[in-house]
């Protein structure tokens, strides 16, 4: 079998393990998943190609499904954009794009466990097409990221949205479809601005009414964006990468971000609300990491 085929099989095995293993709060399986599947041997475009061919993603059926080809072409475009950016940002690199697509897939692997029950459970039930739109958003969310920080709210996220629209226009995707996809994509990608997290999470802490589909999708992308950074080993490494990225512009902040105190503050400032993340015990892992850091 080709390298790609054996990689697809590896991904299939991981999704199966994530569905069956009882790994209550033990980060080992997720650490292994990211370490094993996010290697330099596999390009970002190949990773997306492989994901589109897994049993998991093939199971999200859409009639005349345009998304697998669209996601693969888009990943190639994003990959090319990163290749010509020299040097590539230490954290917001293709490795981060891979992490987010892998994390979103891990969340997607839990759909069969999401309750059909009450109104609040139903808000979490997305259509197959919604999941494909989320994968497209995961590829888009940091497109063209120069490794700087937002000077104004949503600055870099808006740039990613613009580049995504340019890609769709270049690829002669039908205009009415571009309009619909961009209407979904824009609020979801903008929600990944770290400063928006408090606003977004407030909607999920307030149990007065179920959340809109757009908010549920935004939350799942944000959780995918944060997932790898929450793991004890991978998270430490990613903190070091972020420090390298920030060093030229703000060395003080760079020192904080890779310190134990900085990591504790980061972990205390986030949380995981979706039942998909809870099924994977990411919230338990976050709380345990905080305890361990404070015990040091």
Annotate the PLM regions.
Residues 32-34, 74-103, 144-148:
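Active-site flanking loop/helix segments enriched in acidic
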Residues 97, 104, 157-201, 262-267:
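Histidine- and acidic-residue-rich, metal-dependent catalytic cores
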Residues 92-99, 130-131, 155-159:
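Aromatic- and histidine-enriched alpha-helix N-cap/loop-to-helix transition segments
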Residues 45, 62-64, 89-95:
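N-terminal charged/capping segments associated with class I S-adenosyl-L-methionine
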Residues 57-69, 79:
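Low-complexity, highly charged intrinsically disordered N-terminal segments
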Residues 133-138:
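Active-site alpha-helix of zinc metalloproteases
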Residues 1-57, 106-129, 140, 144-152, ...:
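Divalent metal-dependent phosphate-bond-processing catalytic cores, especially two-metal-ion Mg2+/Mn2+ enzymes
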């Amino acid at each position: 079998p080709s390298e790609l085929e054996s990689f697809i099989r590896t991904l299939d095995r991981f999704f199966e393990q994530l569905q069956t293993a009882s790994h209550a709060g033990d980060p080992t399986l997720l650490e292994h998943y990211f370490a094993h599947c996010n290697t330099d041997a596999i390009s970002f475009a190949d990773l997306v190609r492989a994901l589109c061919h897994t049993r998991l993603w093939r199971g999200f059926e859409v009639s005349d499904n345009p998304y697998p080809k669209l996601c693969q072409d888009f990943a190639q475009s994003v990959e090319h954009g990163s290749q010509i950016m020299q040097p590539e940002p230490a954290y917001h690199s293709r490795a981060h794009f891979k992490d987010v697509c892998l994390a979103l897939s891990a969340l997607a692997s839990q759909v069969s466990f999401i309750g059909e029950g009450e109104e609040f459970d139903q808000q979490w039930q997305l259509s197959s097409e919604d999941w494909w739109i989320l994968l497209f958003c995961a590829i888009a969310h940091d497109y063209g990221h120069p490794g700087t920080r937002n000077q104004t709210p949503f600055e870099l996220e808006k740039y990613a949205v613009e580049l995504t629209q340019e890609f769709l226009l270049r690829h002669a995707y039908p205009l009415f479809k571009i309009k619909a996809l961009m209407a979904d994509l824009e609020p979801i990608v903008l929600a990944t601005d770290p400063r928006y997290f408090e606003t977004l999470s407030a909607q999920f802490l307030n149990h007065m009414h179920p959340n809109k589909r757009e908010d549920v999708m935004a939350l799942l992308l944000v959780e995918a964006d944060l997932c790898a950074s929450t793991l004890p080993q991978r998270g430490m490494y990613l903190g070091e990468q972020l420090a390298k990225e920030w060093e030229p512009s703000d060395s003080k902040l760079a020192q904080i971000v890779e310190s134990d105190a900085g990591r504790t503050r980061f972990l205390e400032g986030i949380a995981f609300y979706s039942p998909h993340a809870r099924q994977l015990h990411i919230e338990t892992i976050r709380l345990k990491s905080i305890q361990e850091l404070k015990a040091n």
